[in-house]
């Protein structure tokens, strides 16, 4: 038998034995606990409940009985149900207040404050593969901040493959130009063809920026005038820039243009309206002297005829 009886045995005024069911759960230091349980459920009912349960669940059962008995004593009508309902209503009120506070906070800070910050790739020697794939789509000359600069040696094979498509493109342009020239010649639109391909009506070719004079314009002495520099159109200058850039001139295209030159008429002027030619000094005087020499024989012959008629 224990030296000090438990709270249940002391309240019931009986001896507390070693087999007492209440001794482990109702210590003598807290007699109010057994008073509430005994007042609501009764000692005999509590004994039956504890005997039907395993030892590891008895302590939790005693605590539940105590809480329920205390609530029933404080509120005889609702008991623990009223306390549970009060706690549920209080929880709903707290949730509503929290939602209202969040809405006010969004109104003060703005919608941008709620958006999470963008993902920044880690800076290191080996960036992730997704970041490297995104760098491949960037234009040349753009270096992302925080990334090391990688210098690679030029690949000669890539340069060779890059040059081949350019040559093929030039050949295609030349063949297309020849085909267009033949079509425009058949249509009879020579003036539009001459203006489009850099061929003047006086027989000069301005594809390379120089004019070539016809043989008919040479003097009687057989002296050839030097090539004269002409100011071509914008298309001619662009074509000349492409030819000089690649280091060679498309001779087939020039030959085709020379074949399409119309014959010069007598007395046709070398320069047209809107085209400026820069000839070397002394060429104009040379042509004037040659024309005077050609005109002298007919004049002398006419003078001799007049003298014979007078006699």
UniProtKB/Swiss-Prot annotation:
Transmembrane segments: none annotated. This is LOB domain-containing protein 10. Residues 264-277 have a biased composition (Low complexity). It comes from Arabidopsis thaliana (Mouse-ear cress). InterPro entries: LOB, LOBD. Residues 297-311 have a biased composition (Basic and acidic residues). Belongs to the LOB domain-containing protein family. Residues 4-105 form the LOB domain. Residues 287-296 have a biased composition (Acidic residues). Residues 264-311 are annotated as: Disordered.
């Amino acid at each position: 038998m224990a030296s000090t009886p438990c709270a249940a045995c002391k309240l019931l005024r009986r001896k507390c034995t070693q087999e007492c069911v209440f001794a482990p759960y109702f210590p003598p230091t807290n007699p109010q606990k057994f008073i509430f349980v005994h007042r609501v459920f009764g000692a005999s009912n509590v004994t039956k409940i504890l005997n039907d349960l395993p030892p590891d669940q008895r302590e939790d059962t005693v605590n539940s009985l105590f809480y329920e008995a205390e609530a029933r004593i404080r509120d005889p009508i609702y008991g623990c149900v009223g306390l549970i309902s009060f706690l549920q209503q209080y929880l709903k009120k707290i949730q509503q207040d929290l939602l209202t506070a969040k809405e006010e906070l969004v109104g003060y800070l703005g919608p941008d404050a709620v958006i999470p910050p963008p993902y920044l790739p880690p800076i290191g020697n080996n960036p992730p593969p997704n970041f490297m794939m995104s760098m491949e789509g960037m234009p040349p000359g753009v270096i992302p901040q925080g990334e090391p600069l990688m210098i690679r040696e030029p690949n000669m094979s890539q340069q060779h493959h890059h040059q081949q498509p350019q040559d093929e493109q030039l050949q295609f342009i030349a063949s297309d130009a020849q085909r267009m020239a033949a079509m425009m010649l058949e249509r009879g639109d020579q003036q539009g063809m001459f203006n489009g391909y850099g061929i003047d009506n006086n027989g000069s070719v301005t594809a390379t920026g120089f004019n070539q004079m016809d043989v008919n314009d040479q003097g009687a002495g057989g002296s050839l005038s030097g090539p004269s520099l002409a100011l071509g159109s914008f298309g001619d200058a662009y074509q000349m820039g492409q030819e000089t850039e690649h280091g060679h001139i498309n001779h087939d295209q020039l030959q085709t243009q020379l074949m399409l030159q119309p014959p010069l008429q007598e007395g046709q002027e070398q320069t047209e309206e809107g085209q400026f030619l820069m000839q070397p000094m002394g060429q104009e005087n040379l042509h004037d002297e040659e024309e005077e020499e050609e005109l002298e024989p007919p004049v002398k012959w006419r003078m001799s005829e007049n003298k014979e008629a007078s006699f």
